[in-house]
C-alpha cells in the first residue's frame, strides 16, 4: 500500500514514470545527497584521462538530478536512504501503479499450476522458492550457482507470466548464441512447444515475430528503437554478470512496459556491470542456493581436490 499522503517536511515523493524509471521529487538540499548515494567509482577510474585532468570525479551517477529519474529496481535502496536519514517517503500512484506493488502468492494455486504444466520433473524446494519470490516481487536478480537449474526456474516463471499476461510478449536476453540455442533446447525438453511459441534472434535471424517468447543475444538487439521493445511485459536476463553495462541499460530502459524483470546469474563477482546498476535494471538480489548446500544434498557432486607436484 502507498505510504501516507500527508506531506511532512523533507518528504521524498516517488512515483512510476514507467516500468523502467521512477520519478523522485525531493527538496533542493536532498538532491545532492541522492546523487551521491546512488553513485559508485568506475574500476580503474584513476587512470582515465578525464579523471587525471580533473574533468570527472571517477563516479557513475544513477540518479539524474535534472530529470529526477532513478531506475525502479533501486526502490528498496531509496527506502533505506530515507530510513537512514529519517526522511518521510510518500508513494504516488500513476498509470503504472507504484514501485512498492507486490503480488500475493497463493501457494496451493501455484502448485496446481505447476502440476498442470506436466513438467518432466518437479521443482526442487529452492527452485520453487525462487519462482514464488519472483512472482511476488515482480523483479529480482536470482543468484544461483551452476548446476542449480536456473533455466528450469526461468521456464516456470515465464510459464506463469504467459498464463496471467498473455497479451504481452516475453524477452529473454543472453550473452551468446550458444545460450540462445541451449535455452531453446531446454524449453523443448521441458515439454514446451518451442516451434510454435519461441523465436530466436541472432545474426542472420528475422528480428520480428508474433510468437510470445523471443530469445536473443544482447548484441543483436541493443541498437533497436524503443518501439520494438514496447510490447514486452516481461524481460529475463540470463548470465547477467557477462553483460556490458551500457548495452544492458539501453535494452532494459527501453522496456518501459516490462513490469516483470528477472536477472539470472551464478555469480556477481567480477561482473562486467556494477551490482547497483544490475539491481536498478532487474531488482534486488535474492540468493537462491549455494554450491555447498547442493553438494550436501547430493544434487551436485562434491569436489575431490588432489595436488600434483611436477
Residues covered by each model-derived region:
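Post-Walker A helix-loop "phosphate-sensing" segment adjacent to the P-loop in P-loop NTPases
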Residues: 161-168, 191-195, 259, 286
